[in-house]
């Protein structure tokens, strides 16, 4: 896991170095836009020891600001930052001895975060019309609330599961996020963006030392969102 984290961080740093270097030789732009975004999260948690899970849905939404700095041949380059509310967590999947779903028991944990992604924005297409874009960069978050639901369990069974009733120990979260989508951009109506994005947490929300219950406890989230932006400066 340490090797994976190092590789991901190195890749992001290289992108960060290459991005401003490209900006020095491209056709300059000074487009600044702000707007709103909203969508859904499909959530899972990477646990070691492994826990069978489904992918519960949560909501995400917030504010977006984007600055387009230059156009390098066919590629439009810029930077984007967001301030989002995001529902994450996990839902456990239980099975009977014959492999079918056990509907008599359930457990889920909902975790609400304020997320701030810092993204390199790369788009391909004309200045106005349809563009394909890629967003990639680091993300930080802070837990602002959590809740859990359980049914079909005895007190002894709940006590035997390490994650049940266990409060989140690390409220600060960080990782890498990236994705792509389509943008429809017009001169008068602003920009409409449809995006799919994946978040891979590099931090753990439980302590993960040898003496602790888990070796890994990190978020993994797929987001599908719509964004509307209007230009403050073209």
Where on the chain are the PLM-derived regions?
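Short glycine/proline- and aromatic-enriched beta-strand/turn motifs that initiate or cap beta-hairpins
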Residues: 23-66, 229-234
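Residues on the lipid-exposed face of transmembrane beta-strands in outer-membrane beta-barrel proteins
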Residues: 36-40, 61-67, 83-85, 116-122, ...
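Extracellular/periplasm-exposed beta-strand and loop segments of Gram-negative cell-envelope proteins
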Residues: 44-55, 88-112, 143-173, 204-221
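Transmembrane beta-barrel architecture of outer-membrane proteins
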Residues: 56-62, 76-78, 111-117, 131-133, ...
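Hydrophobic, well-structured mid-protein blocks that either form specific transmembrane helices
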Residues: 96-138
């Amino acid at each position: 896991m340490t090797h994976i984290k190092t590789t991901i961080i190195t890749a992001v740093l290289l992108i960060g170095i290459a991005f401003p270097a490209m900006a020095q030789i491209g056709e300059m732009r000074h487009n600044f836009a702000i707007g709103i975004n909203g969508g859904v999260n499909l959530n899972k948690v990477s646990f070691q020891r492994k826990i069978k899970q489904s992918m519960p849905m949560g909501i995400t939404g917030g504010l977006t600001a984007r600055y387009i700095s230059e156009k390098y041949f066919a590629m439009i380059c810029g930077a984007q930052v967001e301030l989002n509310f995001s529902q994450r967590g996990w839902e456990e999947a239980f099975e009977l001895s014959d492999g079918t779903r056990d509907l008599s028991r359930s457990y889920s944990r909902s975790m609400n975060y304020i997320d701030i992604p810092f993204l390199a924005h790369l788009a391909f297409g004309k200045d106005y019309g349809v563009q394909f874009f890629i967003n990639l960069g680091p993300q930080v978050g802070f837990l602002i609330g959590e809740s859990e639901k359980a049914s079909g369990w005895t007190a002894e069974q709940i006590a035997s599961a390490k994650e049940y009733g266990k409060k989140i120990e690390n409220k600060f979260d960080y990782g890498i996020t990236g994705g792509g989508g389509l943008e429809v951009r017009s001169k008068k109506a602003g920009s409409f963006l449809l995006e799919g994005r994946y978040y891979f947490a590099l931090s753990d929300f439980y302590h993960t030392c040898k003496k602790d219950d888990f070796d890994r406890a990190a978020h993994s989230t797929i987001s599908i969102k719509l964004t509307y932006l209007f230009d403050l400066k073209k």
